[in-house]
Amino acid sequence: MWERKEGDMPTRIAIACDDIGFERKEELKRYLVEEKGAEIVFDPVTCPEEGVNTFARLADDMAEVIQRDVCRLGIYVCGTGIGFTCQINKHWGIRAVQVSDPYSAKRARLSNNAQVIGLGMRVNGLPAMEM
């Protein structure tokens, strides 16, 4: 989706998850930092237990981080990605979508300027890094 060029500032990204998405979030974080040169500026869930029943609070917190221009992009990983995207879309100026394939993720960003994607571990069999 985006490639970092020599001399570019790293893309700043917010990332969060619930207990279901914790392992995939950690994989994504490593991929984004090591392969894409991104900077993770919001990552409040440090163990699976911290993600239990927290999607609404995490959506509100991520929306605030984006609204304050700490970063412009966010990723949330949970069971379906639906509840989180519904909650974060309640915030002014936030455009979030639940995606289940790389093409939809790309079109959401290019056609709709989506800032946040929700990934569902229980509904998405594709490797999330492809998105």
Which residues make up each language-model segment?
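Short, solvent-exposed amphipathic alpha-helices that sit
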Residues: 23-37
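Short, Lys/Arg-enriched N-terminal segments with co-localized hydrophobic residues
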Residues: 1-8
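Short, conserved beta-strand edge motifs with alternating hydrophobic and charged residues
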Residues: 16, 41-45, 74-78
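A short beta-strand-loop structural module common to alpha/beta enzyme folds
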Residues: 39-53
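C-terminal binding/interaction regions
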Residues: 14-23, 102-131
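Helix-adjacent hinge/juxtasegments
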Residues: 58-97
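Short hydrophobic/aromatic-enriched beta-strand-loop microsegments
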Residues: 40-41, 94-101
